[in-house]
Amino acid sequence: MFNNDKVKIGICPIGWTNDDMPDLGKENTFEQAVSEMALAGFKGTEIGNKYPKDVKVLKRALEMRNLQIASAWFSSFLTTKPYEETEKEFIAHRDFLHAMGSKVIVVSEQGHSIQGQMETPIFDGKHHFNEEEWNLLAHGLNKLGQLAADKEMRIVYHHHMGTGVQTTEEIDKLMSVTDENLVYLLFDTGHLVYSGENPVEILKKYVQRIKHVHLKDIRPEIVSKVKNEKLSFLKGVRAGAFTVPGDGSIDFEPIFKILAENNYEGWLMIEAEQDPSIANPLEYAIKGRQYIKEKASI
């Protein structure tokens, strides 16, 4: 199966507190979140809004718990704002992650995104990039990829519901118009299945460019409700569309098998945003970690 020296298991803080909807988990502190991550058996995390902004403070808090920073989300606006604005913010983001020892930077284009809009139907209101926007995106991502490479890091592009890169066709387009040596892919099981894509086929096609993995499961009955009732992405999260691996409908065994057979190296991150007042974060973290141990032997 996996080379246990090359693959690390982490969990994102969004199960404890939601940066897009701060009322979800507002009672959960940074210290509680990272302590429970360590208690549940994880080795890493991504950065949330409640995390200390000082490198020394953050490092000390994580070292006490034997945790590392795997990465952190970066919103680019390459299709809607001057490139220089994104670059300036990216460099600061890159340098912080570099200081924390991270090797990958999660990037998602938020120009024209509806993922943060509370009333826009996620299945009906999505923007589709025109050729000019694709060119702006590709050119900008290649530049960001080079800036990451300058620090011996990589950018991994996060396909996401409600954005211009969501579907199989859009992922194919992104991969074809960007430099394969500068722009890599983040593989997110939940967003692919939510969108109606086949995650196994996408994984097979791009496994050599996939350098970061988000493991999330879906509750199909909630996704159907979101579609039928024309709900937004955020309302879907509140309703419980996502959950940890093993608690929904996705079969992760073939996914683990393909990654292992292709000698995947890097992080496998549980990222499962739901209401922590309903889904206790520690309980679900333990549940997800146990599932990975059972199915991936890691």
Curated annotation (Swiss-Prot):
InterPro entries xrefs: IolE (IPR023952), IolE/MocC (IPR030823), IolE/XylAMocC-like (IPR050312), Xyl_isomerase-like_sf (IPR036237), Xyl_isomerase-like_TIM-brl (IPR013022)
Can you name the source organism? Clostridium botulinum (strain Eklund 17B / Type B)
For this entry, list what GO says about its biological process: inositol catabolic process
This chain's protein is named: Inosose dehydratase
Show the NCBIfam families listed in the entry: myo_inos_iolE
Q: What class of enzyme is it?
A: lyase
Q: Which domain of life is it from?
A: Bacteria
Q: Which family does it belong to?
A: Belongs to the IolE/MocC family.
E.C. code: 4.2.1.44
Residues spanning the signal sequence: none
**Primary gene name:** iolE
